[in-house]
Curated annotation (Swiss-Prot):
Plants contain two types of GAPDH: cytosolic forms which participate in glycolysis and chloroplast forms which participate in photosynthesis. All the forms are encoded by distinct genes. This is Glyceraldehyde-3-phosphate dehydrogenase, cytosolic. Pfam families: Gp_dh_C, Gp_dh_N. It is found in: Cytoplasm. It comes from Magnolia liliiflora. InterPro entries: GlycerAld/Erythrose_P_DH (IPR020831), GlycerAld_3-P_DH_AS (IPR020830), GlycerAld_3-P_DH_cat (IPR020829), GlycerAld_3-P_DH_NAD(P)-bd (IPR020828), Glyceraldehyde-3-P_DH_1 (IPR006424), NAD(P)-bd_dom_sf (IPR036291). Homotetramer. SUPFAM superfamilies: Glyceraldehyde-3-phosphate dehydrogenase-like, C-terminal domain, NAD(P)-binding Rossmann-fold domains. Pathway: Carbohydrate degradation; glycolysis; pyruvate from D-glyceraldehyde 3-phosphate: step 1/5. GO terms for molecular function: glyceraldehyde-3-phosphate dehydrogenase (NAD+) (phosphorylating) activity; NAD binding; NADP binding. SMART domains: Gp_dh_N (SM00846). Keywords: Cytoplasm, Glycolysis, NAD, Oxidoreductase.
C-alpha cells in the first residue's frame, strides 16, 4: 500500500464510534482525520474517549482539546464537526475518503449516501442494513466490487456466527440450524423499567433481568452465505453483562462427523485462512476473558456438545464491541485495496 494511510471519518461517537476510533489510532494503515457528532461538545468527547468502563483508560497518546473544532491525539489533529444533517458534513475538507456511519440512524443506502455529498468516497455502515450490501470479513469480502460505495459491516453477532457456519457448512454441510446469542447489554436498553413501545420486554431493567429478544443475525448469514439462506434462524437473550457475548449454534449436519473431527476442522481453519477472525480455545474460559479480543468469533471446544454424529451444539465467544470495531477497520482496508486495483 506504499505507506500511504487511508483517511477516515466517523459519524456518531457512541460505543462503536469511539471504539472504531481507538482501533484506528492504534494502527499504522489508517488515519483518523474527522469525527462528527452534533450531541457532544469537544471537551466531553475527550472525556468519553479517554475513560471507558469496559476497555479501560486510553493510554496511547495524550489527548487534548486544541479548540472547539479540533482534538489533538499526541500531535495529530482530528477535526470535530457537530452537524445534524449528514449531507452537510464537509468530509472533503479533511480529506476523509472513508466514513464510518455509526449513529445507528442512517443505516439504509439512501441515508448513508448523504455522506458522499460531503466529499466521502465510500461509506461503511456499522450495523446491518436492509438494502446496502453486507460483508463479513473472512466470509464474503472477496465479493466486494469497487463500484459499490456503501457497504454494511453486518452485526457483531453475524460476524461471530458466519465464519463458524461457513467452516461447518463447507466441511460437513448444514441441513438446518438454530442460533441463540447470549448477549451483553447495549445502549438501546433501559437502566430501570421504562417505555419501549415496539419491544415491551426490551423496556425492562437491563441490569436485573434476562430478556428474550429478537435478532436478525442468523437470517443475515443467509445473505452473506447464500448456501445457508433459509437454513438458519435465531433469537437472543440479553443478560446483565456489559460486554462480550456468546453464540450457541445448534445444527443438523449432512455428513456424519464426530465432535473431535469438528473440533479439528475448526482448529485448522483458525490457524489457517481464518487466522485473526476465527479463534479456537480449549481453556476453561468465561466471558470477561474475551474483553479486548479483536477476533470475530472464538470457538469454545470444551463448551460444545454432540448428541450424535449429525446433531451438534457449537459455542463461540465474541467481544461484541472490540471485535466488531476491529472488523470495521479491516473492511475499510479491503474496500480500499479493491478500489485501488
Amino acid at each position: 500500500m506504499g505507506g500511504k494511510k487511508i483517511k477516515i471519518g466517523i459519524n456518531g461517537f457512541g460505543r462503536i464510534g469511539r471504539l472504531v476510533a481507538r482501533v484506528a489510532l492504534q494502527r499504522d494503515d489508517v488515519e483518523l482525520v474527522a469525527v462528527n457528532d452534533p450531541f457532544i461538545t469537544t471537551d466531553y468527547m475527550t472525556y468519553m474517549f479517554k475513560y471507558d468502563s469496559v476497555h479501560g483508560q486510553w493510554k496511547h497518546h495524550e489527548l487534548k482539546v486544541k479548540d472547539s473544532k479540533t482534538l489533538l491525539f499526541g500531535e495529530k489533529p482530528v477535526t470535530v464537526f457537530g452537524v445534524r444533517n449528514p449531507e452537510e458534513i464537509p468530509w472533503g475538507e479533511t480529506g476523509a475518503e472513508f466514513v464510518v456511519e455509526s449513529t445507528g440512524v442512517f443505516t439504509d443506502k439512501d441515508k448513508a449516501a448523504a455522506h458522499l455529498k460531503g466529499g466521502a468516497k465510500k461509506v461503511i455502515i456499522s450495523a446491518p442494513s436492509k438494502d446496502a450490501p453486507m460483508f463479513v470479513v473472512g466470509v464474503n469480502e472477496h465479493e466486494y466490487k469497487s463500484n459499490i460505495d456503501i457497504v454494511s459491516n453486518a452485526s457483531c453477532t453475524t460476524n461471530c456466527l458466519a465464519p463458524l457456519a461457513k467452516v461447518i457448512n463447507d466441511k460437513f454441510g448444514i441441513v438446518e440450524g438454530l442460533m441463540t446469542t447470549v448477549h451483553s447489554i447495549t445502549a438501546t436498553q433501559k437502566t430501570v423499567d421504562g417505555p419501549s413501545s415496539k419491544d415491551w420486554r426490551g423496556g425492562r431493567a437491563a441490569g436485573f433481568n434476562i430478556i428474550p429478544s429478537s435478532t436478525g443475525a442468523a437470517k443475515a448469514v443467509g445473505k452473506v452465505l447464500p448456501a445457508l439462506n433459509g437454513k438458519l434462524t435465531g433469537m437472543a437473550f440479553r443478560v446483565p453483562t456489559v460486554d462480550v457475548s456468546v453464540v450457541d449454534l445448534t445444527v443438523r449436519l449432512e455428513k456424519a462427523a464426530s465432535y473431535e473431527e469438528i473440533k479439528a476442522v475448526i482448529k485448522a481453519e483458525s490457524e489457517g485462512k481464518l487466522k485473526g477472525i476465527l479463534g479456537y480455545t480449549e481453556e476453561d474460559v468465561v466471558s470477561t476473558d474475551f474483553i479486548g479480543d479483536n477476533r470475530s468469533s472464538i470457538f469454545d471446544a470444551k463448551a460444545g456438545i454432540a448428541l450424535n454424529e449429525h446433531f451438534v451444539k457449537l459455542v463461540s465467544w465474541y467481544d461484541n464491541e472490540w471485535g466488531y470495531s476491529s472488523r470495521v477497520i479491516d473492511l475499510i482496508l479491503i474496500v480500499h485495496m479493491a478500489s485501488c486495483q
